[in-house]
């Protein structure tokens, strides 16, 4: 969830189990996501889908993750480590310089987009952390009730 999902999505290869669920739930706490979700989610799933999931905090199932291209492999939960190790072995046995030359430009592309988007998203995250909706979400969490958002 949130930052954890973003970190996973920034990995070179993502192996997920069938019960895996990703979500960026900042919005459910009245906060704009500012941890990189606005960078990687649109790149992997497309802008419209990313907007939906980031604006709603809706969960993305393992099957959806695979269908949308957010994960490379979907396996049974008890096979995650084995599949990840098999992927690592395959890459380790490959031509290191060619593999690096293939991924470095992609990482550079992601870094360039991050440099454009992250300052604004972090600023907006900070701004929304002080909003009445964020205060209400925190209060509701402590009181174990659903928040009632009202800031428009």
Residue ranges of predicted features:
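CoA-thioester-processing core
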Residues: 1-55, 68, 83-87
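Glycine-rich phosphate-binding loop at the start of an alpha helix
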Residues: 2-4, 59, 78, 135
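Well-ordered beta-strand positions
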Residues: 12-13, 52, 56-58, 64, ...
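C-terminal long alpha-helix characteristic of the crotonase
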Residues: 15-20, 71-119, 123-132, 148-152
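Short, structured loop/turn "capping" segments at alpha-beta junctions
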Residues: 18, 47-51, 60-67, 94-100
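Hydrophobic alpha-helical segments typical of transmembrane helices
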Residues: 37-40, 49, 61, 101, ...
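Short, basic/aromatic-enriched C-terminal tail that caps enzymatic domains
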Residues: 137-152
């Amino acid at each position: 969830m949130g930052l954890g999902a973003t970190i996973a999505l920034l990995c070179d290869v993502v192996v997920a189990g069938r019960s895996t669920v990703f979500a960026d739930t900042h919005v459910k706490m009245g906060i704009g996501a500012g941890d990189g979700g606005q960078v990687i989610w649109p790149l992997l799933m497309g802008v419209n889908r990313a907007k939906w999931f980031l604006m709603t905090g809706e969960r993305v199932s393992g099957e959806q993750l695979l269908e949308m291209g957010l994960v490379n492999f979907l396996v049974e939960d008890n096979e995650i480590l084995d599949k990840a190790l098999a992927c690592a072995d395959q890459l380790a046995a490959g031509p290191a310089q060619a593999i690096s030359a293939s991924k470095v430009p992609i990482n550079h592309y992601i870094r360039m987009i991050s440099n454009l988007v992250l300052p604004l998203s972090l600023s907006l995250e900070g701004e929304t952390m002080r909003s009445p909706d964020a205060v209400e979400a925190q209060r509701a969490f402590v009181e174990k009730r659903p928040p009632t958002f009202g800031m428009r």
